[in-house]
């Protein structure tokens, strides 16, 4: 019996039983209105309108097609004052009303100051008031129209100049002739040429003769002083601007005012003749001229490159480049000599105290042997010093046996004729091989060929 039943029919019966149970469990009460109907108790959360919920199709936020256009309500006449009521004219006006009427009827009298202001701002001549009183309203139209900013009237008076500046500018041109008469002819010619030439040609004049314009602040008086130096009269001079006091030689009238506020700064060579003719001790000062200080063209002379200082282990480049066979070297004698002390000149020691490094005279055995005679480019500490102010010349040679030989080339001496013998007596172990390269030295440069052995005491002890 159970096997013959159809499973589909059994499932349908189960679904029906469940639906019936659900209907029985539902509470008995007022049914909710359908979504299409309006309920004033509901409020939509989307649009905020009453009568429907947010899930209703009547909400315009979900369905714009169902949005209702607000209908215009009927015209309400009487609320708007389309025809305003005109005030009735009083039959017996009071004294106050009479005065007001007379003031309105009378044209407004404009004083001359208002007419001038109207003519200034608007740029139009003031119109004449009409007899019906309309001119009073039209004349005040310039107050309503936006106009440009008020012009700022500046006084035509010139600012006061400094009395000291005015006095100097007045006396500058008057006393220029007397100053030119008192100057030297060379300076007078340079002043006349600098004033007649253009700005470009004026810059090529002499550095010491050209008076450069300087200017003055209102407070202090910075003066520009050009001082030629004593140390370099032949090559070039270095001019340094300094803040100095007024000079006694040149008066204030010799200070021409600067036409250009900021002239270009140029650097030109300084001729030595001009500095000697004017005197090395003369100072040129240029006084105040205008408000802002002008940059005076400082005539920077040609500065020769300084010779680099050599350390104790540095080799000069000239010696490396010109290190040939038999090339002598100029060496300054040391301030104190070890072998010949009394013959040392104190003047030479004060002028150029030479810093001569020590040289390894005995080379190590690992080095390859050099040629028989070769000029050594390193300076050597000579044991003897030479009298006089002339430098010593020392020639270094490399021998075959690995030793170094040096020849001292000195100028003629007047009070020490026994010096060659003394040198030969002190160095008896000088090899004869080193005498041959001395012939290669030109006789015009060398006076004596004093050969001094430069081998150390260790090498002497090894030979013995």
From Swiss-Prot:
Compositional bias (Basic and acidic residues): 74-89, 97-114
Entries under InterPro entries matching the protein: FAM90, Znf-CCHC_6
Pfam families membership: zf-CCHC_6
Region Disordered: start-end pairs: 1-42, 70-389, 411-437
Transmembrane segments: none
Compositionally biased spans, kind Low complexity: 180-197
Miscellaneous comment: Primate-specific FAM90A gene family, thought to have arisen during multiple duplication and rearrangement events.
Assigned protein family: Belongs to the FAM90 family.
Name of this protein: Protein FAM90A12
Organism: Homo sapiens
Gene: FAM90A12
